[in-house]
Amino acid sequence: MSSAPLFYGGINVYLQQHIPIFRHLPRFIDRVLDYPRLVSSFAKLPASIDTNDLSALALSMVRGEHGHQRKEVRRLVKWMHHQSRPDVIHFSNLLIAGPVREIKQSFSIPIVVTLQGDDIFLESLSQPIRSRIVSEMQELATLVDRFIVHSRFYAEKMTRYFNISPDRISQVPLGIDATDYLHAASQDRKQADTRPGRRIGYLARICPAKGLHLLIDSFINLKQQSSFDDLKLWVAGDLSEADRHYFEAQEQKIKKVGFDADFYYAGRLSRPAKIDFLRQLDLFSVPAPYQEPKGRYVLEALASGIPVVQPAHGAFPELLARTGGGELFSVDDSGALTEVLANLLTNHEVRSRLAKEGPEGVMATACADHAAQATMDIYRQILSE
């Protein structure tokens, strides 16, 4: 198959949604707007997010050939006609699977869709448009041959949410390319035992859904106890303009009680910087109040040899049962996170055991090779049916 062009380029999608003339302009203009460097530059610009705009765009996208981006659907299908026929077509989520109808009409090719958080986005939208989008997605789901999820919890949730029969959902345990994380974890960490202060870390998107405010509350509670006066909180991750006010409010909470000198925000990190960040922690927690379908950040911490503390809901109980390397806290107990963090911070023996379990568990069950093999097995099964 030749090198694929860009389909559904962000600039074109936006303009086709908002300015009718762009739905009919010739391809040479679309090609200019799809220029990768131009798309990348626009993606980096700060932008405020209008929920109504997002809702309308999502509805249009899932409607496929009946939406405002129908030109993109037709171009994709036309391009596929001139390529070697693929054995399987795999969409990374159902929200972008609008072309499925046209693809099914043109080709006899199995369609696979990974479900990994579509519902989280949908639940952020207001009614009645949310119900319209879900209804369109339920209709799309009937055309999909197989769905892939990363946990039993999410499989059960998706059967209800999109009216999918359980036999059409397969589980592929989440995996990551952990080589450099594992290498870092295997190196001598004696300097971690001699550095001043203990460190709790958070590495995920900065937003209410990931629960940074809950971790900050626990950090403050611990710091107010004399036995944790050396404690520090390190935070890293993407911060959007939409969530800046939320983050500033959290910073003010810490400053108000005089602990700002022990709080550090590292910003968005490259992969090498992530690895270095994680190696310097004693504990890791992203106490997401919503039911996380994946939890990739947990695998990164575990692979780095950092014990994790996560809520006992969503994908986390299954993930930690598989890998070890962490403990769960009850989401129904407001003091449970603080209690588990305190117990681990004061119990070096348990922390050491968990730090050893994490990399071993990731290596045995959660590397990218395991996920790739499980996905290939599903492809083979579909093709044999």
Question: Model-predicted segments: where are they?
Answer:
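Conserved acidic donor-binding segment of nucleotide-sugar-dependent glycosyltransferases
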Residues: 322, 327-334, 343-349
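Glycosyltransferase donor-sugar binding loop
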Residues: 232-251
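Carbohydrate-associated surface elements
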Residues: 153, 175
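A conserved catalytic-core segment of Leloir-type glycosyltransferases
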Residues: 1-78
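Short hydrophobic beta-strand element within catalytic cores of glycosyltransferases
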Residues: 307-310
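A short, well-ordered alpha-helix in the C-terminal region of glycosyltransferases
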Residues: 336, 343, 350-365, 371-377
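Conserved donor-binding/catalytic core segment of Leloir-type glycosyltransferases
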Residues: 191-210, 216-219, 234
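Nucleotide-activated donor-binding/catalytic signature segment of Leloir-type glycosyltransferases, i.e.
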Residues: 247-269
